[in-house]
Regions:
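Recognizes extended acidic, P/S/T-rich segments that occur
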Residues: 66-96
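Catalytic centers of hydrolytic enzymes
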Residues: 133-139, 148-151, 163, 168-171, ...
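Beta-strand-rich modules
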Residues: 87-113
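Secretory targeting and sorting signals
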Residues: 1-28
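Hydrophobic beta-strand positions in extracellular immunoglobulin-like domains
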Residues: 56-58, 71, 105, 392
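Pro/Thr/Ser/Gly-rich low-complexity, intrinsically disordered linker/stalk tracts
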Residues: 29-63, 109-127
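Acidic, metal/ion-coordinating pockets
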Residues: 126-412, 458, 463-470, 552-553, ...
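Structural motif
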Residues: 64, 71, 263-264, 370, ...
Length: 659
């Protein structure tokens, strides 16, 4: 499904329920905008459904392509081209209990907010309206990048409430499939990572997840661990762009390139894809199994082959789970690998993204009936999930249309958490608390992490400065270079919830104050178990390392360098490999790209080529030292000894982005 430049533009999260929309990154002079919501939406019953009328949204650039009209859960959404009248007939389908009409305008920049109709109808009261048996309403519940966020927090829903919400959604529409776009595990809080991520898999089982693709973080550990995860999963692992699935099995359970599910008599084929950058994002060797190393294709050839195979087996609806994401908007155009895949994938009705931890929703009207495509991505850590309603015509054997809602924490506040899932979380939490709720010091505020773009992946950040300085102080090296992607939470950690309620923690939205920090915070921030490595490099090697750090998919990659002992500047508008402008010592003396030797501390992960640092450092000439997280903990303890409070360090200009 090839998209035009304008079609590859977007707005984040429209059709959202109780979730703030993501403001597109755009220049002040950007002439593009998403449509405003339509107005004057009225609804009234008719013989063959509920008629919905509205006043068109004001004209915008790009032009409005049409309107998505939905009746809510269990309904049959329809797409009305903007060239047609501003009226639609919503069929009432078997099993539907209410008709709650909403209308959204869509252009190639994205969706408007959903405008509600003046009336909502209980189907039981529509005695003169024909129930349209030829339509089947399907429901898809989807999340991505859960990263073991099992506990509820100020932002995360928590798996017990997710399980309760999904159970309620299934009750409202039994024709439901629950899916994940990957990164369920890895870079996770201790409640998951300390137990080899099995608590997350057990939670997903209780949530009745049906299928998941792999994300890069599913490979944070060895293939042996992946096999253990597969063995513990009651759901199907699906990936279509791996060179081999031979080693991805445990007993009778095995990963597949596709699987067909039957919902309300309709066969739904699910395919999946992981990001091809996984190899450089995980520890070298993690993709090697007994039969060899898995290669991950950067193209959709395998996915398209799986779609063809699924359709030959009878699949009537295709859902693609793609662990690729949206990154930003530039001059109205969407950026991110997800959209390269959208261009390549042929025959999918729904494409769910992931990986970049963003909220995104778009709609591609097809040229032929039944070829429209919903594209959606959801935020990480269980902050929200998507609920897509898809209408299938059993006579034409085509999808009529789809509509997606974003369900956030406030929207599920009234849902009863699932007791079994809550008990599971408590069981693991109780085992951790005595070790992890131990205070290591106090801080004067929150050391930030994340954002758009993520601070630790785009520039100098307090947590990066403090940690890099701590490493240099301990090992007395000239320089330190560590990857920003290794920082997985703020400090105190947002996703670590102490059992000890006496600890002083930041309230929602509060970033200043004196807060307790614990072992649990440290292990949540640095969950990978990396060790510090010391070695000797030349000035030329340092420049090479920095070019890699500001290359790749900057500012989305985890390779961005957090440094100590020197300064550097870069220009992100220059070609990859030529972005570093200057490198100097702290006193301003230039560091040339020559053979002058320096000592440096980094991580074993980087020494062995992780995050694109292939061939930069020599493993043979490197000494593996202490655990990275232990160095951090010791530094916090030292800085807070005698009751002192560790202040959030101000930026000192060690890293400068000139453009």
């Amino acid at each position: 499904m090839k998209t035009t430049t304008l079609r590859r533009a977007l707005i984040a999260a429209v059709a959202a329920i109780s979730v703030a929309t993501l403001t597109p990154i755009a220049k002040a002079a950007d002439p593009y905008s998403a449509p405003a919501a339509p107005t004057n939406v009225v609804a009234y019953p008719s013989t063959y459904g509920v008629t919905v009328r509205w006043t068109a949204s004001p004209s915008v650039k790009p032009a409005i392509e049409g309107y998505i009209v939905s009746g809510g859960v269990g309904s049959c959404p329809v797409f009305v081209p903007a060239t047609k009248h501003t009226v639609a007939l919503l069929p009432v389908v078997k099993g539907q209990t209410t008709v709650a009409p909403t209308v959204q305008a869509v252009n190639s920049y994205g969706f408007s907010a959903a405008a509600k109709a003046d009336k909502t109808y209980a189907v039981s009261t529509l005695t003169k309206t024909t129930i349209r048996d030829k339509y089947v309403s399907l429901q898809f519940l989807q999340l991505s990048d859960l990263h073991g966020a099992l506990e509820a927090s100020s932002t995360s829903i928590g798996v017990a409430s997710l399980a309760g919400a999904w159970a309620a959604d299934r009750k409202a529409n039994p024709n439901t499939l629950s899916l994940s776009s990957g990164d369920n595990i890895g870079a996770a809080p201790q409640i998951s990572s300390a137990f080899e991520e099995i608590p997350t898999i057990e939670s997903l089982n209780l949530m009745k997840l049906d299928a998941s693709t792999f994300g890069n973080h599913e490979h944070d550990r060895t293939i042996d661990h992946v096999q253990k995860v597969i063995g513990a999963s009651d759901f199907q692992w699906i990936v279509s762009n791996y060179s081999s699935l031979t080693d991805l099995k445990s007993g009778s359970k095995a990963a597949k390139s596709y699987k067909i599910f039957t919902l309300g008599g309709v066969k739904v084929g699910v395919v999946g894809a992981n990001t091809e950058t996984t190899k450089e994002q995980v520890f070298p060797g993690n993709l090697k199994g007994a039969s060899g190393e898995i290669a991950i294709s950067p193209t959709a050839d395998g996915v398209n082959a799986a779609i063809v195979a699924a359709k030959k087996e009878g699949a009537q609806v295709i859902v693609a789970l793609v662990h690729q994401g949206w990154t930003e908007n530039i001059d109205g155009a969407v950026q991110g690998r997800l959209f390269d895949w959208v261009d390549q994938i042929k025959g999918a009705n729904i494409i769910y993204g992931g990986h970049s931890h963003q909220t995104y929703n778009s709609y591609n009207p097809g040229v032929k009936p039944g070829t429209d495509v919903i594209i959606a991505e959801t935020r990480n850590a269980g902050v929200e999930y998507t609920r897509t309603t898809t209408c299938f015509n059993t006579e034409t054997k085509k999808v009529v249309s789809s509509a997606t809602e974003y369900i956030g924490k406030s929207a599920v506040a009234s849902v009863t958490p699932d007791a079994a899932t809550a008990a599971l979380v408590k069981k693991y939490k109780d085992q951790l608390a005595p070790k992890l709720d131990v205070t290591i010091g106090k801080v004067s505020g929150v050391f930030p992490r994340g954002g758009t773009p993520a601070v630790e992946r785009s520039g100098e950040t307090p947590l990066g400065n403090f940690t890099a300085d701590a490493v240099r102080a301990k090992y007395k090296t000239d320089f330190v270079l560590v990857n920003g992607g290794g920082i997985r939470d703020s400090f105190p950690a947002k996703t670590y919830v102490p059992l000890n309620t006496a600890l002083v923690r930041p309230a929602t939205g509060v970033t200043t104050g004196t807060f307790d920090v614990t072992f649990g915070d440290a292990l949540t921030i640095f969950p990978f178990g990396n060790s510090v490595a010391t070695t000797t490099i030349t000035g030329a090697t340092l420049w090479k390392a920095l070019e890699n750090g500001v290359g790749g998919a900057y500012p989305a990659d985890g390779r961005f360098p957090q440094i100590s002992g020197f300064k550097f500047s870069f220009d992100s508008t220059k070609p990859i490999g030529s972005r570093v402008v200057s490198v100097t010592k702290l006193d301003g003396t230039a560091i040339a790209a020559d053979s002058t030797k320096y000592t440096i501390a980094t991580l074993d992960y980087i020494v062995y080529g992780g995050d694109g640092y292939v061939g930069v450092f020599s493993p043979k000439e490197s000494a593996i030292r202490d655990l990275y997280v232990d160095v951090f903990i010791d530094a916090v303890k030292a800085a807070t000894a005698g009751g002192k409070v560790l202040a959030v360090p101000a930026a000192d200009g060690r890293t400068k982005k000139v453009a």
